[in-house]
Amino acid sequence: MADEADMRNELTDMQARADQLGDESLESTRRMLQLVEESKDAGIRTLVMLDEQGEQLERIEEGMDQINKDMKEAEKNLTDLGNLCGLCPCPCNKLKGGGQSWGNNQDGVVSSQPARVVDEREQMAISGGFIRRVTNDARENEMDENLEQVGSIIGNLRHMALDMGNEIDTQNRQIDRIMDMADSNKTRIDEANQRATKMLGSG
């Protein structure tokens, strides 16, 4: 009788331990799901900020291109004014090469984001289930659902990371173009100011 009682106690302890492990496993999947959802929200916020930053860079580049066009017109007016006053044209004809318009330079600009591609492993995992069933109870059902959502969100996070990388590369190239345009515009403005100062001094 004592052996039978000991065995019942041992089975009860094992069942209690199994229940405890089941509860801990379920709580772990809940924490995992919460963490990946927070990561997804952070990724969405980052993509929104990158999109807003891209729009700002577009406006800056358009502004630089407008300055370039305005300087082309200003240089032409200075040349016409110099000729009208009978002055020798300054050796600023070299600036003619700087009169190009940059507005249509779209090198490296991504006009659309890459399409979403579902990984075969994700599809298999979703269709097959993520845990080996032991008790087949509600806890295991929830664990399986949680892990399915975790797998789906992780797949989305991978695609979001690719989108972020592409957008950052595009914006880095755009920033390089803007810096080149700013340097060119500054040089042309300085040289135009020198021409105007000379003409005023000669007058």
From Swiss-Prot:
Residues 19-81, 137-199 form the t-SNARE coiled-coil homology domain. It holds the Pfam family SNAP-25. It is found in: Synapse, Synaptosome; Cell membrane. Disulfide bonds: none annotated. Keywords: Cell membrane, Coiled coil, Membrane, Repeat, Synapse, Synaptosome. GO terms for molecular function: SNAP receptor activity; syntaxin-1 binding; voltage-gated potassium channel activity. CDD domains: SNARE_SNAP25C (cd15885), SNARE_SNAP25N (cd15894). GO terms for biological process: synaptic vesicle fusion to presynaptic active zone membrane; synaptic vesicle priming. The keyword Membrane applies. Residues 1-25 are annotated as: Disordered. InterPro entries: SNAP-25_dom, SNAP-25_N_SNARE_chord, T_SNARE_dom. Gene3D superfamilies: 1.20.5.110. It comes from the Eukaryota. Its main location: other. Residues 1-11 have a biased composition (Basic and acidic residues). Belongs to the SNAP-25 family. May play an important role in the synaptic function of specific neuronal systems. Associates with proteins involved in vesicle docking and membrane fusion. This is Synaptosomal-associated protein 25-B. It comes from Carassius auratus (Goldfish).
